[in-house]
């Protein structure tokens, strides 16, 4: 159950309390992983040191904000004052905040915890000796232990496996969270009826893909209903309701970021990995190919036909896996007429309308009978529309009886047509300035970011922030998850209706339709009433008229959109606050304009060579946006702009210099000069207010001047790809303020100043691609908080020895060609304790280039040593206990694999190396589940690999047992052709395969099991051994949980081939045989979890005379068996000896 559905009082679902030295790397890490996989937001203090007695404030805050606390009592739990104080805090929060505490007794007796016996008694003896002056504190510990050990719902792992214990705890929490997260449904009026009908229509337990359309007018509650059914289906515990992925895509028609952004959001949510496709066609292809095997639940909310959303988001049923359900909400019935189901949402019946209105007007109880009667009058006017009931209820909330009567009388005396007119009462209840703000948002600012809107509104209206809060409180606008100011369509329609009440466009206060603006401009009908013109669409016929604009003395906001005007703009009203014009055709902006009120100037994609030549006094100006000004060579003088906050010069490709007066602008927050390819001179800047400085890809900028002023903690400086040769030391004068420094692809950078090592808060540092950088500062080890360091593609040959002091470093990369010289990594003993990923590929490493004690990197999970020249590897690699992935591809001189770490599950080597050591890989490294072979590009190589791998199984000296169910995935380096290695005799493509077995196929002590191969994604597979005759004989069944072989199984793809072995010892159950022999069973069936696969299968024997005789047999009949009806079968043709080399 997703934690987002939990009560807003909690920041976390679960807080984990544990003794690090006992369970951090075992039980607790597994529990944390399962909780996260279930979508349960869990706080685990990964970096806890457990020194001292006082727990940090942020840890106390996390405990207070967690809905559940899991306490893992282990043998040494009581030895830690940290843990005991943490427990005291947890039990306090249980009392204060009604949190749920779940104790787990990990290899300890609950009575030992409850009564402090055994190891707990010993720990308290030491505490009482050492802290004898803190009697009260010790007593608090004892009480907390006693209370925790007496709690219900505990788990004792002594009578169950770790997996069972974890499953019990996670199921317990999931169930409670599900009930809590769905509790909000109790407050949605009439929702039960909708849920019952929709769930029945969706027929969740039925196979196939279904698309349902929820249709109705705006404001009738379609989104609310869709969200409720979405949460309800996800909250069901029944297995038929389990989906592989789910996504609620809200307010689709308001999307302004392109179709591909919606596709990326949908794919990211469903696949649980970041999707970043740049156009809708790529996104469409990926959705069709990657979701077809996934059972998904999708809601596409508020679809219209403007941008053909359905075509690109749910174009075909074949896009989605069996059992998928797609729900669409829309006002346009014709968009969903071809779907399986259309569910119409109509107005609420009277009794539900009254209930909903009272919920918003009164909260709980109606004050008296007079309000009851007035409520019925309001409900009657609403005509059952939920939006109107909510808005009017909020409007009348906390008003006196006389005010109620006045508002209702106002409704009666104004015969508005339709609900839009009725919603106007909300507008009429606003102050005049708040009304003006509302109309600005409704007519042209809806969907813009909150900060941007406030800046425009504040330039026009006093108290804009307070006014926006009033609009939110009155349910007229709301802030979206993207921090955009949004409103319901009907509310927006109501605002536009108010403005359009006057018939003549020239007499209106606001215009937003291009054709109406064109009419006013061409007929010179502008008047003093005009306050704002905002054209967001392109118009090829819109022409600017100076005469028409001269009549608009009160014009505050003027956005001409993307017009093709070639008429000179000679006049703009002095009252203007915001001017926007895309494709501005002239080389300069008129110097005669006196725009002292101007706040926002945006002239993108213009023909400007310069904005103006003289100094302009613009005291109100906060934003200048001249991005994509391809002909602009210099900026204006900024001296007269003391309040300037944002300057956007992005992709001004001919801009050569920024005026030095920019350094006088102390309020600047953002400077955007990325991709200014010709920029050569940049002034000193004041960084007191600066939050972003973008100089990325400024190729010609070789020098960055000193900066002055105190940096803000959140400042971001992007210089990657620039031509800067050296960095000014003033950037690093404030030691705690920079957390990320990206310097990659700075081709001229020759050195880093030693002052960079003062950045004590630096978390991420990249000098990747700085091809002239030869060394690092000797004090690099002083960067105590550094977690990511990328020095790929540089000339660095030996990092400073101090680098091993970076004990918080997680990722370290020196990847890159060293041009004939050899890279050498310093000794690492007693250092780099947190390092998880080390990339030394392409480093021209030779023997001795790696430290012999590399095995001391205890946290290392991924090591990339590909394309190097060493002949041997340090033997201590075997001591890398956490290592999961090792890359040795294209190491041409490597002749011997070292002993591999025990936890390794992915190995990337060349094919010849894999074949040479396949016996070792198969028999000695059972946790190895994936081998990556970039150079295995033909069927012969795959056949050889399969033959060699399974030959090693047959050559095992011990008997094959159920535990020998080998699973190994081969990454091929290219999408695998539609072909399975021919060594597998039985081949096909289906979600299930049945193979008829020959007579006497089973030879005691000779038959080993079934060798199986299939392509594409790794899924669980079930093997069935089926009797020849239906003589009430039981099937033999074995489920192979292959998807659990690797925690990163989601990485498996069409580039992979999966080999696995079904041992006969694991399939055959003598207790079910009832005296029958294996030869009484004549069919082997494999089921691939409902997903179609390209498969191959082969029976596997030890060599011997009986086997040779069997292999000469042929099946006498090709008739299908009664057991395989409706399932694709592959007939048993001939079978060569396992030891015979590959056919073909």
From Swiss-Prot:
SMART domains: LRR_TYP (SM00369), TIR (SM00255). Pfam families: C-JID (PF20160), LRR_13 (PF23286), LRR_14 (PF23598), NB-ARC (PF00931), TIR (PF01582), WHD_ROQ1 (PF23282). Changing residue 222 to E/N: Loss of resistance. Keywords: ATP-binding, Cytoplasm, Hydrolase, Hypersensitive response, Leucine-rich repeat, NAD, Nucleotide-binding, Plant defense, Repeat. GO terms for biological process: plant-type hypersensitive response; signal transduction. Changing residue 223 to A/N: Loss of resistance. Changing residue 219 to V: Partial loss of resistance. Coiled coil: none annotated. Changing residue 619 to A/T: Partial loss of resistance. Changing residue 218 to V/S: Partial loss of resistance. LRR repeats lie at residues 597-618, 620-642, 643-665, 834-854, 859-880, 882-904. Belongs to the disease resistance NB-LRR family. This is TMV resistance protein N. The gene is N.
């Amino acid at each position: 159950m997703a934690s987002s559905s939990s009560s807003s009082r909690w920041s976390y679902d679960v807080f984990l309390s544990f003794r690090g030295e006992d369970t951090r790397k075992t039980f607790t890490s597994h529990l944390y992983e399962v909780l996260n996989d279930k979508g349960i937001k869990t706080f685990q203090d990964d970096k806890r040191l457990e020194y001292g007695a006082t727990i940090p404030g942020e840890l106390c805050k996390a405990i207070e904000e967690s809905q559940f606390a899991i306490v893992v009592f282990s043998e040494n739990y009581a030895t830690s004052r940290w843990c005991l104080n943490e427990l005291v805090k947890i039990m306090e929060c249980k009392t204060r905040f009604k949190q749920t505490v779940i104790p787990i007794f990990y290899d300890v007796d609950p009575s030992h915890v409850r009564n402090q016996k055994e190891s707990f008694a010993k720990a308290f003896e030491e505490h009482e000796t050492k802290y004898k002056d803190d009697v009260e504190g010790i007593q608090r510990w004892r009480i907390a232990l006693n209370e925790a050990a007496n709690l219900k719902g505990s788990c004792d792992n002594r009578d169950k496996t770790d997996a069972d214990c974890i499953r019990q705890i996670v199921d317990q929490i999931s169930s409670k969270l599900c009930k809590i997260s769905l509790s909000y449904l109790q407050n949605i009026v009439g929702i039960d009826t909708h849920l019952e009908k929709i769930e029945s229509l969706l027929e969740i337990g039925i196979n196939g893909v279904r698309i349902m359309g929820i249709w109705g007018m705006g404001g009738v509650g379609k989104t609310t209903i869709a969200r409720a059914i979405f949460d309800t289906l996800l909250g069901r515990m029944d297995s038929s309701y389990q989906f592989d992925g789910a996504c609620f895509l809200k307010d689709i028609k308001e999307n302004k970021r392109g179709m591909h952004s919606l596709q990326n959001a949908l794919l990211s949510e469903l696949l649980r990995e970041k999707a970043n496709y740049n156009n809708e066609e790529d996104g469409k292809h990926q959705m069709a190919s990657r979701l077809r095997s996934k059972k998904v639940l999708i809601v596409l909310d508020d679809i219209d036909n403007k941008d053909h959303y359905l075509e690109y988001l749910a174009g075909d049923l074949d896009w989605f896996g069996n059992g998928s359900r797609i729900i669409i909400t829309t006002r346009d019935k014709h968009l969903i007429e071809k779907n399986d189901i259309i569910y119409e949402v109509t107005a609420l019946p009277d009794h539900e309308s009254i209930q909903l209105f009272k919920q918003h007007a009164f909260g709980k109880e109606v004050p008296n009978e007079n309000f009851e009667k007035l409520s019925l009058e309001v409900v009657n006017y609403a005509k059952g529309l939920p939006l109107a009931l909510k808005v009017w209820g909020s409007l009348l909330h906390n008003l006196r009886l006389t005010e109620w009567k006045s508002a209702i009388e106002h409704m009666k005396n104004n015969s508005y047509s339709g609900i839009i007119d009725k919603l106007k009462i909300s507008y009429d209840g606003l102050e005049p300035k708040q009304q003006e703000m509302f109309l600005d948002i409704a007519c042209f600012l809806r969907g813009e970011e909150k900060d941007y809107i406030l800046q425009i509104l504040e330039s026009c209206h006093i108290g804009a922030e307070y006014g926006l809060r009033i609009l939110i409180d009155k349910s007229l606008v709301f802030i979206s998850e993207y921090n955009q100011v949004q409103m319901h369509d009907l509310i927006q329609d109501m605002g536009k209706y108010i403005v359009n009440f006057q018939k003549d466009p020239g007499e209106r206060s606001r215009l937003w339709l291009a054709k109406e603006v064109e009419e006013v401009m061409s007929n010179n009908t502008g008047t003093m009433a005009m306050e704002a013109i905002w054209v967001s669409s392109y118009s090829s016929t819109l022409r600017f008229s100076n005469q028409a604009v001269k009549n608009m003395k009160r014009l505050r906001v003027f956005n001409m959109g993307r017009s093709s005007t070639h008429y000179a703009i000679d006049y703009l009203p002095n009252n203007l606050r915001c001017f926007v014009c895309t494709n501005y055709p002239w080389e300069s902006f008129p110097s005669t304009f006196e725009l002292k009120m101007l706040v926002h100037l945006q002239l993108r994609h213009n023909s400007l060579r310069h904005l103006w030549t003289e100094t302009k006094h613009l005291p109100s100006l906060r934003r200048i946006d001249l991005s994509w000004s391809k002909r602009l060579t210099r900026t204006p003088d900024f001296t007269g702009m003391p309040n300037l906050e944002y300057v956007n010069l992005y992709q001004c490709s001919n801009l050569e210099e920024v005026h030095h007066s920019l350094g006088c602008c102390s309020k600047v927050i953002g400077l955007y000069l990325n991709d200014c390819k010709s920029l050569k001179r940049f002034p000193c800047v004041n960084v007191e207010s600066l939050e972003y400085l973008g100089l990325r890809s400024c190729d010609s900028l070789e020098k960055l001047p000193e900066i002055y002023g105190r940096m803000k903690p959140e400042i971001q400086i992007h210089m990657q790809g620039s031509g800067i040769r050296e960095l000014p030391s003033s950037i690093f004068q404030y030691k705690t303020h920079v957390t990320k420094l990206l310097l990659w692809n700075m081709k001229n950078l020759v050195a880093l100043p030693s002052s960079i090592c003062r950045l004590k808060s630096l978390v991420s540092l990249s000098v990747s691609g700085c091809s002239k950088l030869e060394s690092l500062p000797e004090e690099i080890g002083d960067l105590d908080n550094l977690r990511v360091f990328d020095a790929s593609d540089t000339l660095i040959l030996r990092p400073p020895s101090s680098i091993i002091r970076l004990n918080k470093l997680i990722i370290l990369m020196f990847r890159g060609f060293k041009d004939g010289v050899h890279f050498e990594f310093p000794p690492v003993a007693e250092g780099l304790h947190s390092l998880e990923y080390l990339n030394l590929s392409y480093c021209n490493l030779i023997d001795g280039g790696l430290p012999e004690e590399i095995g001391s990197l205890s946290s290392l999970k991924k090591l990339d040593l590909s394309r190097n020249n060493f002949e041997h590897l340090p033997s201590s690699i075997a001591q890398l206990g956490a290592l999961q992935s090792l890359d040795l591809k294209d190491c041409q001189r490597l002749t011997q694999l070292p002993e591999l770490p025990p936890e390794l599950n992915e190995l990337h080597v060349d094919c010849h190396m894999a074949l040479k050591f396949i016996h070792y890989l198969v028999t000695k490294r059972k946790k190895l589940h994936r081998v990556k072979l970039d150079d295995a590009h033909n069927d012969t190589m795959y056949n050889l690999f399969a033959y060699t791998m399974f030959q090693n199984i047959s050559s095992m000296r011990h008997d094959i047992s159920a535990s020998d169910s080998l699973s190994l995935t081969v990454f091929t380096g290219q999408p695998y052709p539609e072909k399975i290695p021919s060594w597998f005799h039985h081949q096909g493509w289906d979600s299930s395969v049945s193979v008829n077995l020959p007579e006497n196929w089973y030879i005691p002590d000779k038959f080993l099991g079934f060798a199986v191969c299939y392509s594409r994604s790794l899924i669980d597979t079930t093997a069935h051994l089926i009797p020849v005759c239906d003589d009430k004989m039981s099937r033999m069944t074995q489920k192979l949980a292959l998807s659990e072989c690797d925690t990163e199984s989601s990485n498996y793809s069409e580039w992979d081939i999966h080999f696995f072995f079904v041992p006969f010892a694991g399939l055959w159950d003598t207790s079910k045989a009832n005296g029958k022999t294996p030869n009484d069973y004549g069919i082997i069936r494999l089921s691939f979890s409902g997903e179609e696969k390209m498969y191959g299968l082969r029976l596997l024997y030890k060599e011997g005379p009986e086997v040779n005789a069997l292999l000469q047999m042929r099946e006498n009949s090709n008739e299908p068996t009664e057991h395989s009806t409706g399932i694709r079968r592959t007939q048993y043709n001939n079978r060569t000896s396992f030891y015979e080399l590959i056919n073909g």
